[in-house]
């Protein structure tokens, strides 16, 4: 039957599943066609185990019933007297034709007149059960009570949930995990994590964080900065110019092999040529392509977390976003991680920062699916009013059933662990969070060490005397009598030009002092810059050069910096020596200073203040530039020296 979306969806299942389900569907239809006046054949009880276990989970099955003419009633799907028997027959024949083709026999699904399929027997009495809102319900299978209506939207919702719950098992493939691990500079990341943990311990003597917590932070930063890239529209494959979205293209066999059922057409009007953008859903392929939008980002990032041995789960938001959660053993809770934003532990980012109208957010791991909507909202009544796609009792029982099936072969200890974690989550969900003005959804709770590790407080500078970086002349710089340093914000790297192009990775590593500062990447605008942390009234950053230890003194200095402000934001630049302080503009031009002559110390400082409203922190920025300007530097200091 042309245009039957239900049959098309049904045909996407494996042959084994299709044959089982199609037999049931044909039987339901044949019972009505042969016995048009028998009411019992016009009704299917939703609580019937045959329906709930064999039809409900299968893609397209329930849609076929709706296309036949069945309608939802309170406890049943009913074929009303007003429904078209001819329409039912057409859908039935379409399914039968596909079944014949798959069986390779012409008489397997014959017409109703010749059919020998017995009528569907009367279903057994329903099993009594009651919906429980308690966490224990997640650990035991409880059939959905017959009073819960089942709708086409329920079928769509369940299919999405089951698809995601099945997909996360891909991350558990040992060979795929090994392949992913080979893509990660894990030794470097673990080294950085140890250093970050040391800084957290310095900031808070009572720090109870673990190395894995820091590893997550470094993995997020590396993934966004060095591994994966965002795609709006791909450049033209012929001229490299801009393209415009222009519908979809048919997926190739290779696309389908890598689970890309959708291929976007990015069209170049100059070349009149299409560039294909397959939306791969197979994380193995994403290790190769390393690009996409939030779906590809979260899919690949979750795999990398599992490859590193982190407990991770894939988070699906029904308002069209996905991300990851990682379980922190030290904090005994699930931590929000958004690789697109390089955001960690900021669950209110979407509702408060982005203004999203949330409704359903589900978490999927190899052992469990959970409704975690309430972690991501501080407006619970508003969210509840929007949760109308499925009934709450139906959702609860569906999740319980899926968990019971997935966990049936787990050991008692693991089951108890999952249950205990669920209890902790439920307690967390009871009290909605209250973001403070200017947080932009950033989490200000948590230990001082945790906030310091994430760069969200000036506490990371509490031990400034032991963390200050001072540049002193190397032997080659002493010989050339010249010091030259640059910083590239896109690569987040310093280049010590005068010392054999020595590189220093990380904006903090070349700084003397920093206070309330962080590096921000905007994937929507494709821009990057340094700014003060969210909620901070000011930010400060300085760089120091001292040539006295090398027996040298300064003759002159030149500085080039660039800053950008919006609304009432301000950036004040200054250059200080042992005796004087001079202010200068951050206009991107090279400014020379002769008044440094004879001095031995030089400090360049930027102070960021002002701005309006909740995004005031964004209104004063250092070194703002495109993420595509990989060679551009907007910070440069040159010092000419002579012997003392």
From Swiss-Prot:
Its main location: cytoplasm. One of its GO terms (cellular component) is cytoplasm. It comes from Danio rerio. It is found in: Cytoplasm. GO terms for biological process: glycoprotein catabolic process; peripheral nervous system neuron axonogenesis; positive regulation of BMP signaling pathway; skeletal muscle tissue development; swimming behavior. Keywords: Cytoplasm, Hydrolase, Metal-binding, Zinc. The keyword Transmembrane does not apply. The lineage of its organism: Eukaryota, Metazoa, Chordata, Craniata, Vertebrata. GO terms for molecular function: metal ion binding; peptide-N4-(N-acetyl-beta-glucosaminyl)asparagine amidase activity. It catalyses: Hydrolysis of an N(4)-(acetyl-beta-D-glucosaminyl)asparagine residue in which the glucosamine residue may be further glycosylated, to yield a (substituted) N-acetyl-beta-D-glucosaminylamine and a peptide containing an aspartate residue. Specifically deglycosylates the denatured form of N-linked glycoproteins in the cytoplasm and assists their proteasome-mediated degradation. Cleaves the beta-aspartyl-glucosamine (GlcNAc) of the glycan and the amide side chain of Asn, converting Asn to Asp. Prefers proteins containing high-mannose over those bearing complex type oligosaccharides. Can recognize misfolded proteins in the endoplasmic reticulum that are exported to the cytosol to be destroyed and deglycosylate them, while it has no activity toward native proteins. This is Peptide-N(4)-(N-acetyl-beta-glucosaminyl)asparagine amidase. The keyword Zinc applies. Binds 1 zinc ion per subunit. SMART domains: PAW (SM00613), PUG (SM00580), TGc (SM00460). Gene3D superfamilies: 1.20.58.2190, 2.20.25.10, 3.10.620.30, Peptide N glycanase, PAW domain. Residues 127-141 have a biased composition (Low complexity). Its cofactor is Zn(2+).
């Amino acid at each position: 039957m042309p245009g039957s979306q239900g049959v098309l969806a049904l045909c996407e299942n494996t042959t084994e599943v299709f044959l089982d389900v199609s037999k049931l569907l044909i039987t339901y239809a044949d019972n009505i066609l042969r016995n048009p006046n028998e009411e019992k054949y016009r009704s299917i009880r939703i609580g019937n185990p045959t329906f709930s276990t064999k039809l409900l989970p299968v893609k397209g099955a329930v849609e076929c019933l709706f296309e036949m003419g069945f309608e939802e009633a309170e406890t049943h799907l009913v074929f009303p007297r007003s429904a078209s028997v001819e329409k039912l027959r057409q859908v039935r024949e379409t399914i039968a034709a596909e079944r014949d083709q798959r069986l390779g026999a012409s008489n397997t699904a014959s017409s109703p007149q010749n059919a020998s399929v017995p009528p569907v027997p009367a279903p057994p009495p329903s099993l009594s059960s009651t919906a429980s809102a308690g966490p224990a319900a997640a650990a035991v299978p409880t059939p959905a009570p017959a009073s819960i209506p089942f709708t086409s939207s329920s079928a769509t919702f369940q299919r999405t949930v089951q698809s995601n719950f099945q997909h996360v098992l891909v991350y558990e493939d040992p060979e795929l995990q090994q392949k992913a691990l080979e893509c990660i500079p894990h030794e470097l990341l673990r080294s950085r994590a140890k250093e970050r943990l040391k800084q957290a311990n310095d900031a808070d003597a009572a720090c109870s964080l673990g190395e894995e917590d820091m590893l997550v932070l470094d993995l997020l930063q590396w993934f966004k900065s060095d591994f994966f890239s965002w795609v709006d529209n791909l450049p033209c494959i012929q001229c490299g110019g801009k393209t415009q979205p222009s519908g979809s293209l048919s997926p190739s066999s290779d696309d389908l092999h890598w689970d890309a059922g959708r291929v976007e057409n990015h069209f170049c009007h100059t070349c009149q040529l299409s560039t294909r953008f397959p939306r791969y859903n197979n994380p193995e392929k994403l290790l190769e392509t390393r690009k996409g939008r939030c779906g590809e980002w979260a899919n690949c990032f979750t795999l990398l977390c599992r490859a590193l041995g982190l407990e991770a789960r894939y988070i699906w938001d029904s308002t069209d976003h996905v991300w990851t959660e990682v379980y922190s053993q030290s904090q005994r809770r699930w931590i929000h991680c958004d690789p697109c934003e390089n955001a960690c532990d900021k669950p209110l980012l979407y509702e408060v920062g982005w203004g999203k109208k949330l409704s359903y957010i589900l978490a999927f791991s190899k052992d469990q699916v959970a409704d975690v909507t309430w972690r991501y909202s501080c407006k619970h009544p508003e969210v509840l009013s929007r949760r109308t796609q499925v009934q709450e009792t139906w959702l609860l029982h569906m999740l319980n059933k899926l968990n019971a099936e997935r966990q049936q072969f787990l050991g008692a200890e693991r089951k108890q662990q999952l249950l205990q974690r669920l209890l902790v989550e439920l307690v967390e969900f009871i009290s909605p969070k209250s973001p403070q003005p200017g947080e932009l959804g950033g989490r200000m709770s948590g230990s001082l060490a945790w906030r310091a590790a994430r760069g969200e407080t000036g506490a990371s500078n509490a031990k400034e005397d032991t963390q200050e970086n001072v540049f002193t002349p190397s032997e080659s710089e002493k010989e050339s009598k010249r010091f030259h340093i640059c910083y590239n914000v896109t690569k987040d790297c310093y280049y010590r030009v005068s010392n054999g192009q020595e590189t220093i990775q990380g904006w903090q590593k070349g700084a003397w002092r920093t206070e309330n500062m962080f590096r921000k990447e905007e994937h929507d605008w494709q821009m990057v810059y340094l700014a003060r942390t969210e909620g901070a009234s000011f930010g400060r950053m300085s760089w120091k050069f001292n040539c006295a230890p090398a027996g040298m003194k300064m003759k002159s200095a030149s500085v080039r910096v660039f800053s950008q402000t919006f609304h009432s934001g301000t950036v004040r630049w200054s250059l200080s020596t042992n005796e004087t302080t001079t202010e200068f503009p951050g206009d991107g031009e090279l400014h020379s200073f002769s008044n440094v002559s004879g001095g031995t110390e030089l400090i360049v400082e930027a102070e960021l203040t002002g701005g309006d409203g909740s995004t005031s922190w964004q209104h004063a920025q250092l070194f703002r530039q495109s993420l595509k300007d990989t060679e551009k530097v907007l910070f440069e200091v040159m010092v000419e020296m002579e012997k003392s």
